[in-house]
């Protein structure tokens, strides 16, 4: 994605140096070893391998990733590698290109994936994409990502569909190539609840929101097609936005071909959404500052996002409802029984950490993780196959839409000096990793 130009035009903040993992990864891997972290996620920047998206390979980029993966494997910090984590090359947005809305990008992605599978055989855990629904939402619903369009549900669904076709083709290529390891996809999945479960209109609002965020990509992954009511809802919302969907027979064939080969599903989960039915025009405001109460979410054809009384929220208005993760995992198991296993690939709390004399007391983050892990254990007891948990995140970092004040890390970063400091949550997490017990 053309993030550099997009962020420069906004003028809010710069993505440099962020956490500088490119240069600091030996330090971060050492922290992993010291604090009981045996696996972390990392992505390959497509344009570091193919600067123009296709064609000539950059040998320096290839060498860097070999070194990174070797260092991590030697340290016992296993790499779980994503091929495209919000950074589709800018080349696909030039000369009239619209990223994955342009179908030739699908084929380019598959060729890039094939190269990586063959080149980086030391990697045994692959994900194709990170958070396709978030990509669509930021690009075409909220409009705070490049493309920067708002309320275009037609383009949002089309983008997700095209990316899912790319995922499916890459998954088939991985298995046809006989590569060792596993492959899946990471999605940001978010439970949707009616504000009043006894109100049919609220239930319908929650169902429509669920199609946007969850069912569209889950159907594509585990059904190999879109269920009739899923397609009906998506088509309705596309028409409200003034567009049509282009779902071709050969696309469905590609999704179907991948069905046996989706080895795992990565679930990124932070919050849920309560919805009520409402009539009116679109009105969404993203809270990217931490000014609590400033977010709005009203989507025509869906409804309005609300806060249920007694349910806490973060300063960024994200609803804290750990039980929702349990509901989500059981739902995946019940609705898509052909799934094989899940990883919780992101879970954590954005917080305004206070740095005082080298110590960061982030008790709310500890409480957040403890509650979510407890519900994960309950889901496992209920028959869900959860094979791993990745806290988001290892260290504080730059956020595309929030800048630097929304910190997620177990390790605090002084962005001026790049020094790392363990937070209270890092010590708590170390204890959990070493004992297997959810300590208070």
Predicted regions and their residues:
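N-terminal structural segment of carbohydrate-active enzymes
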Residues: 1-58, 62, 68, 74
């Amino acid at each position: 994605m053309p993030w550099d130009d997009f962020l420069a035009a906004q003028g809010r903040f710069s993505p440099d140096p962020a956490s500088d993992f490119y240069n600091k990864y030996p330090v971060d891997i050492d922290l992993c070893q010291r604090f009981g972290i045996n696996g972390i996620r990392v992505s390959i920047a497509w344009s570091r391998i193919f600067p123009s998206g296709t064609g000539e390979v950059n040998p320096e980029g290839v060498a860097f990733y070999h070194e990174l993966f070797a260092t991590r494997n030697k340290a016992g910090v296993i790499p779980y590698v994503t091929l495209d984590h919000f950074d589709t090359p800018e080349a696909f947005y030039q000369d009239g290109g619209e990223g994955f809305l342009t179908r030739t990008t699908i084929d380019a992605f598959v060729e890039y994936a094939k190269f990586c599978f063959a080149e980086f055989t030391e990697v045994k855990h692959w994900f194709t994409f990170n958070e396709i629904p978030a990509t669509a939402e930021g690009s075409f619903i909220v409009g705070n990502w490049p493309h920067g369009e708002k309320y275009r549900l037609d383009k949002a669904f089309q983008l997700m569909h095209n990316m899912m076709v790319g995922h499916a083709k890459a998954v088939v290529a991985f298995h046809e190539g006989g590569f060792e390891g596993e492959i899946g996809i990471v999605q940001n999945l978010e439970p949707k609840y009616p504000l009043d479960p006894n109100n049919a209109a609220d239930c319908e609002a929650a169902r429509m929101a669920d199609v946007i965020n969850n069912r569209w990509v889950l159907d594509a992954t585990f059904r190999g097609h879109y269920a009739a009511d899923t397609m009906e809802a998506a088509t309705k919302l596309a028409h409200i936005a003034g567009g049509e969907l282009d779902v071709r027979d050969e696309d469905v064939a590609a999704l179907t071909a991948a069905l046996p080969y989706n080895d795992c599903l990565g679930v990124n989960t932070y919050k849920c959404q309560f919805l009520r039915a409402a009539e009116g025009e679109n009105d969404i405001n993203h809270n990217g500052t931490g000014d609590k109460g400033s977010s709005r979410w009203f989507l025509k054809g869906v409804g309005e996002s609300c806060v249920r009384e007694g349910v806490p929220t973060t300063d960024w208005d994200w609803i804290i409802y750990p039980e929702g993760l349990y509901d989500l995992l059981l739902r995946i198991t019940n609705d898509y029984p052909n799934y094989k296993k899940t990883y919780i690939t992101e879970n954590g709390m954005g917080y305004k950490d206070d740095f005082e004399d080298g110590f960061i007391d982030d008790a709310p983050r500890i409480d957040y993780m403890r509650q979510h892990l407890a519900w994960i254990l309950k889901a496992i007891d209920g028959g869900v196959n959860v094979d791993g948990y990745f806290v988001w995140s290892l260290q504080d970092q730059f956020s595309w839409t929030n800048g630097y004040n929304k910190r997620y890390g177990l390790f605090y970063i002084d962005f001026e000096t790049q020094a790392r400091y363990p937070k209270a949550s890092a010590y708590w997490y170390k204890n959990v990793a070493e004992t297997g017990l959810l300590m208070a």
